[in-house]
Amino acid sequence: MKRKKKRSSGKRTALVVLCSVLAVILTAMLGVTVAAHSLMNKMNRVDGSQSTISLEEMQAYLENQKQEETGSGPAISDGDVDWGGMISTLLGDSDDVINILLIGQDRRPGETRARSDSMILCTVNRDSKTIVLTSFMRDLYVQIPGYGNNRINASYAWGGMELLNKTLEQNFGIYIDGNVEVDFNQFADIVDLLGGVPMELRKDEAAYINSDTQSSLSAGMQMLSGKQALSYSRIRNLDADADFSRTNRQRKVLSALFDQVKDSGLTTLLGLLDEVLPMVTTDMSNGEILGYAAKVFPMFSKATISSQRVPADGAYKGVMIDGMSVLVADMDLTRQMLQETLAD
């Protein structure tokens, strides 16, 4: 009888210890979850289906756009544009590929939502452990669902994230999982929080930044401050290809920032997020963000980063349509490139 008592007592003790350990683990998990949600709640939220503009507002927008026009090129009619073949499958509509659209706004005083000045698709492929940054040129001529044909950046001004996502899906067959928007002025603050960004500068680039920010940079590798990185990202008049070089510089800065972040420890990363997230606007829920983070974090430090742009060299022509200077992409070639670089 005594032996049975001891065995029973031992079982109870083991059970108590096991339950205590389990309680500690569950409490820790709950604490992490609560902390994570508290961190995510620092972001600004917007409904993906932001209000669209009225017909009158759109007409005023188009008229203002024509008045600002300074480009040139052979004139063609809207009916001459070849929109390519039918799209059968969506790129990124799988568990191994996550497509997050990064939207940069250069909002002017009094504006609540401007044209998207920068659109960079961040594609994370868990299977190949790659991150691809794809810039979409703002003068790209596309079909905008419900609004006709215009520059791609107009879709954001007219219908926010949802319309921009629908535009990318209809024209390029890309499935967007979520959107992240940063105002360019906030972008400078983010760079400063990361301690600056390393960038190789040409002599003329350094001179431009110096003039723009009252700095004293020289050619070669430099650690740029937030204002200097923003100035660098906006350069478009030093090269013959203007806006193409500008988007290339933006991808360079973003790639360098990714490299800095992925080399940071968890404690440092959490500290950065605490400071950065209040500067970010998204249409994703906390659950969606944490779900994507759980998928990406294990491979993030080992991921290789590459970049590209749409349209690519040799896959577009610069023309005038209805008084607008636009880029008309070879849709079939462009979709083929995206299939090769973004598909799992």
Descriptions of predicted regions:
Residues K2-S20, A28-D344:
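Non-catalytic, solvent-exposed segments at the cell envelope interface
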